[in-house]
Amino acid sequence: MPKRSDIKKIMVIGSGPIIIGQAAEFDYAGTQACLALKEEGYSVVLVNSNPATIMTDKEIADKVYIEPITLEFVTRILRKERPDALLPTLGGQTGLNMAMELSKAGILDELGVELLGTKLSAIDQAEDRDLFKQLMEELEQPIPESEIVNTVEEAVAFATEIGYPVIVRPAFTLGGTGGGMCANEEELREIAENGLKLSPVTQCLIERSIAGFKEIEYEVMRDAEDNALVVCNMENFDPVGIHTGDSIVFAPTQTLSDIENQMLRDASLKIIRALKIEGGCNVQLALDPHSFKYYVIEVNPRVSRSSALASKATGYPIAKLAAKIAVGLTLDEMINPVTGTTYAMFEPALDYVVAKIPRFPFDKFEHGERRLGTQMKATGEVMAIGRNIEESLLKACRSLEIGVYHNEMSELAEVTDDALVEKVVKAQDDRLFYISEAIRRGYTIEELSELTKIDIFFLDKLLHIFELEQELAAHVGDVDVLKEAKRNGFSDRKIADLWNQTANQVRATRLENNIVPVYKMVDTCAAEFESSTPYFYSTYEWENESIKSDKESVIVLGSGPIRIGQGVEFDYATVHSVKAIQAAGYEAIIMNSNPETVSTDFSVSDKLYFEPLTFEDVMNVIELEQPKGVVVQFGGQTAINLAEPLSKAGVKILGTQVADLDRAEDRDLFEQALKDLDIPQPPGQTATNEEEAVEAARKIGFPVLVRPSYVLGGRAMEIVENEDDLRSYMRTAVKASPDHPVLVDSYIIGRECEVDAISDGKDVLIPGIMEHIERAGVHSGDSMAVYPPQTLSKKIQETIADYTKRLAIGLNCIGMMNIQFVIKDETVYVIEVNPRASRTVPFLSKVTDIPMAQVATNLILGKSLAEQGYKDGLYPESNHVHVKAPVFSFTKLAQVDSLLGPEMKSTGEVMGTDVTLEKALYKAFEASYLHLPTFGNVIFTIHDDTKEEALDLARRFDAIGYGIYATEGTAKFLNEHGVHATLVNKLGENDDNDIPALVRTGKAQAIINTVGNKRTYDEDGAAIRSSAIEAGIPLFTALDTADAMVRVLESRSFTTEAI
């Protein structure tokens, strides 16, 4: 069926900010879809609130709106643009829920907009637990016994009837939000109450637990002519009971017999046909390991995290083809762009094994609840490809960047047997390492399979890895054993440990004996047909399929898995850098390990190596490709950390040189550079042990900001008030960086701002200054940023521009750099310099219209700013106001305190743009799901340090007609100063009148809660904050953010005055 000619303009809804459960995979899907629709000649309108995406670049769609994805704003855009159709299936749960809302509000009918891809009835059938159950019964597909409930009592009654354990699944939520496994009534009451609250339709499904079954996923495609195929099947290493986004996953399935595979494949195809889905769909099934019994767990009628993984695992571009199916093309008339010869109807076949391991944020959240269950907690993931399970698993382990280079964590050697068994049984994010440790201690794989319900086949592979370790230790220097270990994915570093050598010695032995990897192509057809994709993985075999081209090449290092502090912003910069390298006439080669992102789409670069970002793996590619040089500026700290070892090995680092990178990162050198350039900085010192730190702090004076050098996202950073706190910090946190000392700085409370600059060594272009709304003390990644600055005088802006230029030239920066300033009493201090692209690059590129990463890449390749048409100095300001606001994923992370400080906690960002600051702020708050009605009540619970300041806020809330509740000390203070505040208890003293009760009953619309600089962990405060997070009401832990919210409310409210 040819494509439809009755529709001309199509609107695509993006997935908004990155949160746990909905990450960069939707930028990849959305980008592919928009380009595919444009390729077919349609006019594309895109709405997405997240500026850090490639998808929101001007050239991806014909019109791009970076606006909140809310009914109010999307309706406005629909009325203005009048598209013929809407494609919501590429925007994750956000896109689907938005389509449902638009339909229910009658907007789609009013404007005659047709839904493409998946009909509303199918979305409803897949998402609404009751309808899904009915459909499965009609198709005679088995599902676990279950009951839909709307109250906690109904849940308890059903669970009593079928017996525990049971699983709670809220309707229409994302990544298992609010759900969980309950072993008894007490757990059920707690989880069901929370789940009903979080479900937009107050509905949960209570179902019999089938934990322990194998979890299998099928990624399926169907078109309007009812052609359907399985793109990829995948098997979870972890059994049912752990969210698939938090599971280690292998593709293709490893332990199924042919009969089982056919049975589940037939079920998946039957379901997608019954739902009449046009496009991609993901079916999750549970298989009883002891019989042919299976259950259908759930169906996602949209492109998902698993589809991104399936696309990268097979090379089959699901989102691109799904978009084309949505406009009427069929699978048997589209060519598979990978082979260029076979049709899209042809099911991919794999002659390799893919392993995916999730990346968790617990390195940032020490207090977080690490137990895994049906609610997702991972922020990102890595993927690795090998010729066997051992190889792909070990490559994935060293891609994680959690300080391991094998399936082993050295600190687990200290764990007692009892603690070890508990961690093996009760899965946490690091269970793989505990199981591997148990095998090293002699636990049998039969025992472990019994304890974990993980298939013995996988445990046998871990046993094989251990046997190879013993083999290596027994045969030091043996070349045959070395070959065998390399074929099974061992890193040089691990072999070096076992041989008591250095990794470089092992590497030398390898090279002498010509034990080097070959690179195999990912071609979707197991080498059956000719294929031309430049997409490779390494393995230790014979035939190399990656041929070095005659063109001079440049390698760009990506940023690895998405984690807090290093998000999709760096992928954005990587992709732009590649575009510039290609435009300059070089061959652009990307190395990266993240399956979710645009940079690992093989059509982006000339060659893609899907490999871990470690010195060994990068060096192997460099030795084959012999590039002109390597670009490390755009891959975040991951790539910067590789600059020194690569440079020592004789690799040319393009852009700012390693010695200069060091001057920005090494404290003493940096202080000296600032002194030489005559630029003020907060007084500080370095310390290598506890006594030195205390000595330094006495000299500088408390409060001080302490942190290790060389970290990203403010890891292990704290503001300390006194000597005791400092001593405890030195004892607990300093492990963060043993070779690098700890920095002790005077903590200056002032206005903070930051600058991204691009320098060619002579001229320095400053696209703009971003002013932070929160004062110093809140990590820049968690602050709201405003461009252009609203409160900085011309003189201060000139000073900032002058210091920026001095620093860029003084540090011999070629390419990009990011500088953070704090301003107190009209003095501008430099807090830190990052000699690389930072997380604000996409935002600033969008608001100034300067493709910053491309400009910087051209400089790195030798083309000056003047040659590119840019002048030295501060770029003229935009006439709109733009606000970048952080978005957090606290609802997914139990026991993580939502108090903001110098350690970064946000997972994503949104942008609000308008003609005034108030309007831009309103949009930013709406886009980040912080909705405040124009009247209501606000709760104040304020630390003594900030009461004076909170008084002004309370007066303003009072003036616009808000009711004020306050805890004891705060209420007394406010009432004494003429603001009427109603007393409320902190916690539990009287249950009807404590803060959680007010929040529960909907009497409070926001909470403002500050703590002093002392920031010790306070349980009451944490409980108050989490009650706001659970209820989804705005929580402000910085008065500056609350002040911004009041400005918005003031601009939208009316005054009532007597005449």
UniProtKB/Swiss-Prot annotation:
GO BP annotations, alphabetical order: 'de novo' UMP biosynthetic process; glutamine metabolic process; L-arginine biosynthetic process
Residues reported to bind Mn(2+) 4: 832, 834
Entry binding sites for Mg(2+) 4: 832, 834
Free-text comment on the cofactor: Binds 4 Mg(2+) or Mn(2+) ions per subunit.
Cofactor names: Mg(2+); Mn(2+)
Protein residues bound to Mg(2+) 1: 284, 298
Positions of the UniProt region annotated as Allosteric domain: 930-1059
Annotated binding of ATP 1, by residue: 129, 169, 175-176, 208, 210, 215, 241-243, 284, 298
A Pfam family the protein falls into: CPSase_L_D3
Ranges where the record places region Carboxyphosphate synthetic domain: 1-401
Coiled coil: none
GO molecular function term, any single one: ATP binding
Residues in MGS-like domain copies: 930-1059
Amino acids binding Mn(2+) 2: 298, 300
Origin organism lineage: Bacteria, Bacillati, Bacillota, Bacilli, Lactobacillales
Pathway named in the protein's UniProt entry: Amino-acid biosynthesis; L-arginine biosynthesis; carbamoyl phosphate from bicarbonate: step 1/1; Pyrimidine metabolism; UMP biosynthesis via de novo pathway; (S)-dihydroorotate from bicarbonate: step 1/3
Keyword Mitochondrion: no
Occurrences of domain ATP-grasp (ranges): 133-327, 671-861
Region annotation (Carbamoyl phosphate synthetic domain) ranges: 547-929
UniProt free text on domains: The large subunit is composed of 2 ATP-grasp domains that are involved in binding the 2 ATP molecules needed for carbamoyl phosphate synthesis. The N-terminal ATP-grasp domain (referred to as the carboxyphosphate synthetic component) catalyzes the ATP-dependent phosphorylation of hydrogencarbonate to carboxyphosphate and the subsequent nucleophilic attack by ammonia to form a carbamate intermediate.
Subunit composition and interactions: Composed of two chains; the small (or glutamine) chain promotes the hydrolysis of glutamine to ammonia, which is used by the large (or ammonia) chain to synthesize carbamoyl phosphate. Tetramer of heterodimers (alpha,beta)4.
Gene name, Swiss-Prot/TrEMBL: carB
Name the record gives this protein: Carbamoyl phosphate synthase large chain
InterPro entries: ATP-grasp, CarbamoylP_synth_lsu, CarbamoylP_synth_lsu_oligo, CarbamoylP_synth_lsu_oligo_sf, CbamoylP_synth_lsu-like_ATP-bd, CbamoylP_synth_lsu_CPSase_dom, MGS-like_dom, MGS-like_dom_sf
Summary of the function given for this chain in its UniProt record: Large subunit of the glutamine-dependent carbamoyl phosphate synthetase (CPSase). CPSase catalyzes the formation of carbamoyl phosphate from the ammonia moiety of glutamine, carbonate, and phosphate donated by ATP, constituting the first step of 2 biosynthetic pathways, one leading to arginine and/or urea and the other to pyrimidine nucleotides.
Residues bound to Mn(2+) 1: 284, 298
EC number: 6.3.4.16, 6.3.5.5
UniProt keyword Cell wall biogenesis/degradation present: no
